[in-house]
């Protein structure tokens, strides 16, 4: 549905040249929810704006629905853009128009008959859960409701693709979850292809089928969400994954934590489990094999792309030789183990 090939984007600021994207290629199959994650300034907003040519690439090809957009005339591009909806971090609603009027606007600009506008807008407001807000004004809506209006407006022309530019960044966590569930529901019901960009791995984890990691204008990793979470190939992907599971060391342990082992001290370990290592009874196996005892301090588990992954803080009791052997064995069985210190 979306195919970007060898996209390069260069901005000129006076005598200064800024390369925002460098030879980026990305394929989003029809009906998928595809996430692009990166830090601020990585180039993700430029990338998504190249899809509908809000930013025209310096080099490369943009195919949407089998159509090459970069070669279209202005009128042809306008027609093609009707098949590409877009929502933003800021909702960009017209304050002087009601909810109904905001959603109706693209249909009015397309000279759609009034009866058809009424039918379509009513249908869309029901779809996004705002069937009772026809006559409300944006000033009287919450942030989540405003984004729902923006989603309905983006769907007004019945597009095949929806682009989401940091669509949940301005929302609180509970509202973010509800908007993501709405996008997932729309994808399921309408078969809509969704390309979203974000700096939050939680967003990717909740709804995406595939994910690409962007850094300094280049895609450094891309795969299914389950594969990236199970076997991240780059340090940046690992960092984003760690941000979704975070365990703080309890204060009483922090007060006792030492950088080097002392008499009768034991190592405090941070363990990350992904893929098959989540379900395997690895800790009990280390107890049997190496005569160590694991005291679990805290743990957390979650799902991404249908795959479980988890994190755990433990004390490992045993001799130095036993604990070292147990740690090496865990690492051989795809558990990432970090010694945080000694308590």
UniProtKB/Swiss-Prot annotation:
Keyword Membrane on entry: yes
Record EC number: 7.4.2.11
Keyword presence, Translocase: yes
Stated family: Belongs to the ABC transporter superfamily. Methionine importer (TC 3.A.1.24) family.
Main location (coarse class): membrane
Keywords: Amino-acid transport, ATP-binding, Cell inner membrane, Cell membrane, Membrane, Nucleotide-binding, Translocase, Transport
Molecular functions per Gene Ontology: ABC-type D-methionine transporter activity; ATP binding; ATP hydrolysis activity
Quaternary data: The complex is composed of two ATP-binding proteins (MetN), two transmembrane proteins (MetI) and a solute-binding protein (MetQ).
Gene this chain is encoded by: metN1
GO cellular component, one term: plasma membrane
Domain ABC transporter, first and last residues per copy: 2-241
Enzyme class: translocase
PANTHER family on file: AMINO ACID IMPORT ATP-BINDING PROTEIN, METHIONINE IMPORT ATP-BINDING PROTEIN METN
Task of the protein: Part of the ABC transporter complex MetNIQ involved in methionine import. Responsible for energy coupling to the transport system.
Catalytic activity, reaction form: L-methionine(out) + ATP + H2O = L-methionine(in) + ADP + phosphate + H(+); D-methionine(out) + ATP + H2O = D-methionine(in) + ADP + phosphate + H(+)
InterPro entries linked: AAA+_ATPase, ABC_MetN_proteobac, ABC_transporter-like_ATP-bd, ABC_transporter-like_CS, ACT-like_dom_sf, MetN_ABC, MetN_ABC_transporter-like, NIL_domain
Residue positions binding ATP: 38-45
Cellular compartments annotated: Cell inner membrane
PROSITE patterns linked: ABC_TRANSPORTER_1 (PS00211), ABC_TRANSPORTER_2 (PS50893), METN (PS51264)
Protein name per its UniProtKB record: Methionine import ATP-binding protein MetN 1
Annotated membrane topology: Peripheral membrane protein
